């Protein structure tokens, strides 16, 4: 099993604008999302996880335990009830929005990468991050 905890930098992105459109993200925020190169850091503190995403504009942090629902405010302003689960080398995040669209993120880990599939209303984006 590949390690999950670590720091990752965006290397490539496919269909991200279409995914953001499906979420209902406005044009200005989509433009910023397309040009940013986020760094994602996953830290495991004995089962208490911290997911930290850093861009030039904003840093967000989400603390969670696997299988337990947490409140999440997303980068695009949605409030969600979010649950993370682990299936082999995949960390799955399901956002159930209280208003707006819900989404699912599947992060698959290898020794050198994190491959993230983002899904909303049948639209899928693939982003590849390089492990630092």
Predicted regions span which residues?
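Hydrophobic small-molecule pocket/channel-lining residues, especially in calycin-type beta-barrels
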Residues: 1-132
């Amino acid at each position: 099993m590949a390690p999950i905890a670590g720091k990752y930098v965006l290397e490539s992105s496919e269909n991200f604008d279409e995914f953001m459109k499906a979420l209902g993200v406005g044009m200005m925020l989509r433009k910023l999302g397309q040009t940013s190169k986020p760094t994602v850091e996953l830290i495991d503190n004995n089962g208490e996880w911290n997911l930290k995403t850093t861009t030039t504009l904003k840093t967000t942090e989400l603390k969670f335990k696997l299988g337990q629902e947490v409140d999440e405010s997303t980068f695009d302003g949605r409030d969600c009830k979010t649950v993370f689960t682990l299936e082999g080398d995949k960390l799955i995040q399901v956002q159930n929005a209280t208003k707006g669209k819900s989404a699912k993120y599947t992060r698959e880990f290898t020794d050198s990468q994190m491959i993230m599939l983002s899904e909303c209303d049948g639209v899928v984006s693939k982003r590849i991050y390089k492990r630092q």
